[in-house]
Amino acid sequence: MIESQKILVRHEGNTPRERSECGWRDRLISREDATLEPAAWAHAVDIDGAKPHFHKVATELYYVLDGGGSVLLDGFKHEVRKGSIIHIPPGVVHSAVGRMRVLVIGIPGIGEADYFEVVNDNVNYA
């Protein structure tokens, strides 16, 4: 990172990898990069058991890098595959099933205070 210009070049594989609410993620640009004052964060996520949830503040963009499956947005199922992009505004309950690698961009970055799991959801997400 070039401090004076707040520029970042980072390569997948040289990033923190961790279990998240939606699967395994590589933090490409994240809360650890606060000194950059990023307009958003970006994670590469291997979807695995993403539970229904929503955000009150953040918008999410999903771009399917590989694989496929479906995303559920406010109870409606949408098939996705490599090359699909999904726009998820604040307040939309969403989940994903299938085997896919997704670039997830949170605008602004999504913190734990803006993650709300939906516990009593009667929609069949399979």
Predicted regions and their residues:
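Double-stranded beta-helix
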Residues: I2-H11, R19-S20, T35-P38, V97-A126
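A short glycine-rich, His/Asp/Glu-containing loop-to-beta-strand
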Residues: N14-P52, A58, I105, D114
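Short acidic-glycine-tyrosine-enriched beta hairpin
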Residues: G75-G91
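Glycine- and acidic-residue-biased ligand/ion/polar-headgroup-sensing regions
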Residues: G49, V57-S70, D74
